[in-house]
Amino acid sequence: MKYTMQLISRDELKRKLERKDQFKLVMALGDWQYRAKHIPGSLHFPTLEDARAELAQDDEIVVYCSNSACPASVLAYEYLVRHGYTHVRRYAGGILDWEEAGYPLEGEMVAAKTP
């Protein structure tokens, strides 16, 4: 299957979250990584099959992982597209890019802000 991977920028993703747009933000890493640190509002599924069971094919979906070199979001993107999902985009920068911009994260490894 030939396709062009659809990407979303950090700033566009931030705007979508701020506007509370209707879309599914999916972290494509393991459970321990999700528990440690993720973008607020993210969903996590133990397997890609679980994601397919929970996501509608016409949902707008953004997948991400840890950074631009991480293959997990590429694999999740390709899997969803191959299974008929039509509105999938990849946030290539991932958690590292989000955190470097100073945007909020949630999870057990996120430092608490001091007043």
Segments predicted by a language model, with ranges:
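Short loop/helix-cap segments at secondary-structure boundaries that form the rim of catalytic
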Residues: 34-40, 52-56, 98
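Flexible, polar/low-complexity N-terminal or interdomain linker segments that lie immediately upstream
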Residues: 1-34, 106-115
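Short amphipathic alpha-helix with an adjacent loop that forms part of the alpha/beta core around
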Residues: 16-17, 49-58
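Short, flexible helix/strand-to-coil boundary loops that buttress conserved ligand/catalytic motifs
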Residues: 17, 38, 102
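Short active-site oxyanion
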Residues: 19-25, 40-41, 86-87
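Short acidic-hydrophobic, aromatic-tinged amphipathic segments that line or gate anion-handling sites
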Residues: 8, 44-46
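Short, hinge-like loop/turn segments at secondary-structure boundaries
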Residues: 43-44, 61, 104-109
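Catalytic cysteine-centered active loop of the rhodanese-like fold, especially the PTP/DSP P-loop
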Residues: 55-99
